[in-house]
Amino acid sequence: MDKRLKEYIKSGGTLGSLAKLPKGRAASAPFPCDPAKVYAKQVDGLALRLKRIGVKDVVIGVSGGLDSALVLLVAVGAFKKLSLPISGIHAYTMPGFGTSKRTKTNADLLCEGLGVKMETISIAKSVRQHLKDIGHDGKTPDAAYENSQARMRTLILMDKANMVGGIVLGTGDMSEIALGWCTYNGDHMSMFGVNSGVPKTIVRKVCKWWAEESGQGSGGRGQESGVRSQESGGRSQRSRGRGMAAKALLDIVATPVSPELVKGQVTEDKIGPYELHDFFIWNFCKNGLGRKALYDAAAKRYGKTFGLDLIGRTLDTFLYRLVSQAFKRNCAPDGIRIFSFDFSKESWSIPSDMPTGIL
């Protein structure tokens, strides 16, 4: 057992369902990635889940961001694999107070290019009424203002899934799950977490790969993985659809990550670069490095890119949130394991009351 955890237990803490931490190994580059293989694993995982539970309809909230874009691509691939009609993919975009024209447009274009019908449901009116009902002024951009939007979207998706006898596909990725960067019982919850085993940096790589494969229009791996539209029409129509989806996807890849709960939000301005967080996830959870070793390894690898001050602040954020937000991981939906570990309780967990100072 890790000596830090022994000290924690001696001080009165309990392990609960903590998975045994590995002995400290040398730091390594995080999450070795072949985008085609990651995508194929996600497609296979979703297809297997749908087949086992006998469901032919899925519901997805498409925001125009990276995570929901990848889930939509995986759903198209899984439906192709199962020979299911693409009409069983129900996409919804739910603009709120911080939604930008760029993300809304990209959500529309991506769905159109893939041949997926999408419905727009504005949450502004219902959230304003909810905030009024609970005595909120509807203007102060506090936690209730932001989280009520995320929970309203989840409520809509869950009810829509009930209406079609389907399941809600979760969009949260492995990095967000590690950090608890989600709204409890909002985007935190779904019926199957398609991205739960894929960190943010890999989500970006897979989306970029998909767009480049599709944009070639040569009928290569991308079409075999479900890129080819299932809608009827000639070759030129399919080619235009692929081109439209690829163009939208490349702009999504270039868009700063944001939940868009208030205007101008940029996630990495608040929590630090996802490139660092994914490095910390891999080297803490898999390689067992402690705080000092993590900092030294990150400084050596990323010092010139991010600077030592940002590395230190991001590491503090990572360790604090990894522990303090563990309660969200303790009641998360099933997902797909892509790499050698994930944040399911059967794979890797940590006491949510552990003092981060011992890490």
Positions of predicted regions on the chain:
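ATP/NTP-dependent adenylation/nucleotidyl-transfer catalytic domains that generate, transfer
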Residues: M1-G64, S68-G217, R238-L359
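Intrinsically disordered, low-complexity repeat regions of secreted/extracellular protein precursors
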Residues: Q216-R238
